[in-house]
A protein has these predicted regions:
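Conserved PLP-enzyme active-site core in the AAT-like
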Residues: 1-189, 196
Length: 197
């Protein structure tokens, strides 16, 4: 996310993002992008009227996760993309928690999709990596900046990621089955008020 936002935004630009998101992403946007003159606006997750109202001539990107972290709110990607297209603002979805097994935001027309490969894609909690998807021409500035910032992955990290991808489909099938069973059990439990699943 750092490479994408730093390569696509300049002083005076603004981004609007739904407030349910990974705290480090929110921290980077609110504390660090502001030092470079980029304005960050947060709106309640799923409130597309509030998101539209926050958009102005300086808005360059709409940002969300789907599902969100930590509440697992599924964002309506069709509305998200439609709002971006109607206002000519680029869209970014962090789909880490869904993984490409469950959700492919590019197929909805999202401009950029992020995944933390450290989590489900790697699967063994032993690598740090990320994935950014989008049009090749739109990613060219990111490729340039990542070399400057030093965020190029080692061959060993890529080996670990490839190892994780070999079992990715099986792990996600089991993860989905187990998650469904646990959610159904908890929904029936008398001491549980609400289940986020």
């Amino acid at each position: 996310i750092v490479g994408l936002l730093m390569s696509r935004l300049s002083a005076g630009d603004e981004i609007v993002f739904f407030d349910q998101c990974y705290h480090r992403s929110r921290e980077f946007c609110s504390k660090h992008l502001s030092r470079f003159g980029v304005v960050t606006r947060q709106v309640p997750t799923g409130d597309f009227d509030a998101m539209e109202a926050a958009i102005n001539a300086n808005t360059k990107m709409l940002v969300s996760e789907s599902p969100t972290n930590p509440h697992l709110t599924a964002v309506d990607l069709e509305k998200f993309v439609a709002l971006g297209k109607s206002t000519e603002v680029e869209t970014l979805i962090d789909a880490t928690l869904a993984t490409p097994f469950n959700l492919r935001p590019i197929e909805f027309g999202v401009d950029f999709v992020l995944h933390s490969a450290t989590k489900y894609l790697g699967g063994h909690n032993d690598l740090l990596a990320g994935v950014l998807c989008g049009r090749s021409d739109a990613l060219a500035p990111v490729r340039s900046l990542r070399g400057i910032l030093g965020s190029v992955n080692s061959a060993h990290n890529m080996y670990l990621l490839e190892r994780g991808l070999k079992t990715f489909e099986l792990r996600m099938q089991r993860h989905n089955e187990n998650g469904q069973r646990i959610a159904e059990f908890l929904e029936q439990h008398p001491r549980v008020e609400r289940v986020y699943y």
